[in-house]
């Protein structure tokens, strides 16, 4: 009988939720929901130097914003933060010490650095050399007594089986194998401050919480043999491991870096700019996984139903900001008006543009939006000075029929009554200019659009003219003549 599926996302509260960590959480979430398993949030907060105030709250809030829920977490369960589990770690440290599978190490940082320097100078791969090698029992006891008398606080190191082979069948990458002799020697499982190291604590946590599958980024592959050593030393069965490929920048082909200014990499950024969470969820789900076929827009429920861990990609996932923005635009275009207006409203309010025309403006530009904050630059025309024309726009306005078109259309607007000035009545006036002048197509529409809005492209022209107002539209046309 197979074990119940229990997976976890275990962030460190050391900053904002990065797109890579969000993907780890999302794939674990999809896997659990697809197979009727349990999705657990555990906080790995033992790195006190990097601890960020409010880091945990920020992580959880952004996961909730994306649309994820979980079954167990620090919000509902005790001891789901590593800092609350120190007694448990100590119990297993003491067990390994008593069994001779671990030992206290008194070597100092200065001695380690000097040895590393010597090894590098000799062209050797840096590794820890057991400080007790060649010592008799009496010499060892004397060494320890002298070190303790000098106030040196020991670490605890796991005794590595140098001839051991540590292998697993990875859910993504297939068979992977490491030799114990290539790990770097006996490694620290408890630091001088009494806190466990990551590779020790995570094993105790995963065993204690009965985690069945560990799905994470492939930057953790090198951690896995160390974790398998701890499972072996404690006599526990290891979970299955799956290591997702790196996320790379689609433009540079290199690993996604926080210095890549052409990408939005933190979930907080998407929230602040007014993206729909459903769009971000959909986009992240396709970073390193796809269900097959050409379709790319999926609801959360569809993604859960389609998720198949066997389709996790073995190739790096390309993060393409343009693709993200295309997908976001698809979601905003097809969302109901109330949803989009609610996203745009805070931006309009902050800019002092929450006027009686606000709803009409959102409706006008809804098909163009990639994020709600774009409503401000898109509506500048209605609240700011006429924009400076680009060279391409100036070239259009230098056309020989432009003056004829603008004079004729200005006359049509001037002849319209206030009662008749509505979007549905403006388009017939443009067609009337076409009939009178014989000018049509781009030579007709483009000069009017540029004269009124200062742009070659935009929403429906009659709607733009209506919301701008007759007087302002006429004023803009006059300025072009």
UniProtKB/Swiss-Prot annotation:
The keyword Cytoplasm applies. The keyword Cytoplasm applies. A motif ('KMSKS' region) lies at residues 255-259. One of its GO terms (cellular component) is cytosol. It comes from the Bacteria. One of its GO terms (molecular function) is glutamate-tRNA ligase activity. Its EC number is 6.1.1.17. ATP binds at residue 258. It catalyses: tRNA(Glu) + L-glutamate + ATP = L-glutamyl-tRNA(Glu) + AMP + diphosphate. Signal peptide: none annotated. InterPro entries: aa-tRNA-synth_I_cd-bd, aa-tRNA-synth_I_codon-bd_sub2, aa-tRNA-synth_I_CS, aa_tRNA-synth_I_cd-bd_sf, Glu-tRNA-ligase_bac/mito, Glu/Gln-tRNA-synth, Glu/Gln-tRNA-synth_Ib_cat-dom, GluQ/Sye. A motif ('HIGH' region) lies at residues 11-21. Keywords: Aminoacyl-tRNA synthetase, ATP-binding, Cytoplasm, Ligase, Nucleotide-binding, Protein biosynthesis. It is found in: Cytoplasm. GO terms for biological process: glutamyl-tRNA aminoacylation. Catalyzes the attachment of glutamate to tRNA(Glu) in a two-step reaction: glutamate is first activated by ATP to form Glu-AMP and then transferred to the acceptor end of tRNA(Glu). Belongs to the class-I aminoacyl-tRNA synthetase family. Glutamate--tRNA ligase type 1 subfamily. Monomer. This is Glutamate--tRNA ligase. It comes from Streptococcus pyogenes serotype M1. The gene is gltX.
